[in-house]
C-alpha cells in the first residue's frame, strides 16, 4: 500500500486547523504531513471560513410545489484554524508512526435563525438560536508499516485513539411551535458525550477499519 494514501488521509483530518506551534523535523514523512496541513489551511482561511461571521442573510424560494423562506442573523464559527500538534513521530527502527493532534475548541454562536417551508400546502417551520462548543477534539493513533518511502511502504495496521473533551450547549430550538430546547440541550451536553465515551473503543476500531479500507481501495 502506498504511504502517500495514508499521509493524505491524516492531513485531511487536520485540514480545518493550523498548527499553533512550529515543528522543525528532519523526518520527511512528518514534514510532508505538516506541509499538507498548511496548504489546506491556506485554502480555508482564504475562503473566509475561520472565523466565519454572518451578520444577516436571508433566502427565499417560490416554486410550484415548494415555497421556502430562511434567514440567519449574527452567526459566528471559530476555532477550526487552531490545532495543537502534541506528537508526530516516525520510529524507523520499529516501523511505527505515532500521531496526536488536538483542536482545543470549535465554537458556534447563532443570534437568531429560522426556516419556513410550504410543501404541498403543508407548512413546516423551525427556529434556532444559542451557542455550541466542542472541546478538545483529539485525533491520535499509531500506524505500523513495512518498507520505506524509497522502496515503497505497506501499511500493516492502524490503531486509532480519538475522542472529545466535552460539549457545552445552550440552544433554543422550536419546531412547528413546539419547544425542544431542553431535550436537545440534555442530548448534546450529556447523552452524546457519554455515548461517545462508552463506545470509544468500538468507534476507534471502526474508524481504523474504514481508513484501512480506503487505503486498500486506493492502492
What are these regions (language model features)?
Residues 144-212, 216:
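Extended amphipathic ligand-handling, pore-lining, and cofactor/metal-binding catalytic surfaces
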Amino acid at each position: 500500500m502506498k504511504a502517500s494514501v495514508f499521509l493524505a488521509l491524516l492531513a485531511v483530518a487536520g485540514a480545518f486547523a493550523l498548527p499553533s506551534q512550529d515543528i522543525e523535523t528532519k523526518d520527511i514523512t512528518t514534514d510532508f504531513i505538516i506541509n499538507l496541513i498548511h496548504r489546506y489551511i491556506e485554502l480555508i482561511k482564504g475562503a473566509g471560513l475561520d472565523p466565519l461571521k454572518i451578520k444577516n442573510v436571508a433566502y427565499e424560494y417560490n416554486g410550484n410545489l415548494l415555497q421556502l423562506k430562511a434567514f440567519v442573523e449574527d452567526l459566528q464559527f471559530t476555532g477550526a484554524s487552531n490545532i495543537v500538534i502534541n506528537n508526530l513521530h516516525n520510529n524507523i527502527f520499529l516501523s511505527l508512526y505515532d500521531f496526536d493532534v488536538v483542536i482545543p475548541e470549535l465554537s458556534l454562536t447563532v443570534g437568531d435563525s429560522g426556516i419556513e417551508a410550504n410543501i404541498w400546502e403543508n407548512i413546516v417551520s423551525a427556529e434556532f438560536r444559542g451557542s455550541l462548543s466542542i472541546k478538545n477534539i483529539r485525533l491520535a493513533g499509531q500506524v505500523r508499516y513495512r518498507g520505506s518511502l524509497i522502496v515503497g511502504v505497506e501499511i500493516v495496521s492502524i490503531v486509532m485513539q480519538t475522542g472529545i473533551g466535552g460539549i457545552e450547549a445552550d440552544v433554543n430550538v422550536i419546531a412547528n411551535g413546539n419547544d425542544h430546547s431542553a431535550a436537545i440541550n440534555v442530548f448534546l451536553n450529556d447523552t452524546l458525550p457519554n455515548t461517545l465515551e462508552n463506545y470509544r473503543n468500538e468507534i476507534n476500531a471502526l474508524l481504523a477499519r474504514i481508513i484501512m479500507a480506503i487505503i486498500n481501495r486506493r492502492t
